[in-house]
Amino acid sequence: MFTLKKSLLLIFFLGTISLSLCEKERDADDDEVEVIKQEEKRGFLNTAMNTVTNLAGTLMDKAKCKIRGC
């Protein structure tokens, strides 16, 4: 009876450890997904901001050219 309890306790302990490791990996994967989404947002905002900046610069150059008579 003692060996049965001992082996059941060992199985329970190993199962608990493996479950906790799986949860940690799952949490780590969720964090990676959030980081990727933030990078995508940042990439989109940077692209949009660069486009607006370039467009504004081009419009300013054209306005200066019209004023000066290029």
From Swiss-Prot:
The cysteines joined by S-S bonds are: C65-C70
Q: Which residues are part of the propeptide segment?
A: 23-40
Q: Where is the signal peptide?
A: 1-22
Instruction: Tell me where in or outside the cell this protein is found.
Output: Secreted
Chief subcellular location equals: secreted
Any Pfam family hit = Antimicrobial_2
Q: What keywords are assigned to this protein? A: Amphibian defense peptide, Antibiotic, Antimicrobial, Cleavage on pair of basic residues, Cytolysis, Disulfide bond, Hemolysis, Secreted, Signal
Output the superkingdom of the source species.
Answer: Eukaryota
Q: Which GO terms describe its biological process?
A: defense response to Gram-negative bacterium; hemolysis in another organism
Q: Where do transmembrane segments lie in this chain? A: none
Q: Which family does it belong to?
A: Belongs to the frog skin active peptide (FSAP) family. Ranatuerin subfamily.
Q: What is the annotated role of this protein in its UniProt record?
A: Antimicrobial peptide. Weakly active against P.faecalis X29. Not active against fungi. Shows very weak hemolytic activity against human erythrocytes.
The name of this protein is: Ranatuerin-2SN1
- Recorded source organism is Sylvirana spinulosa (Fine-spined frog)
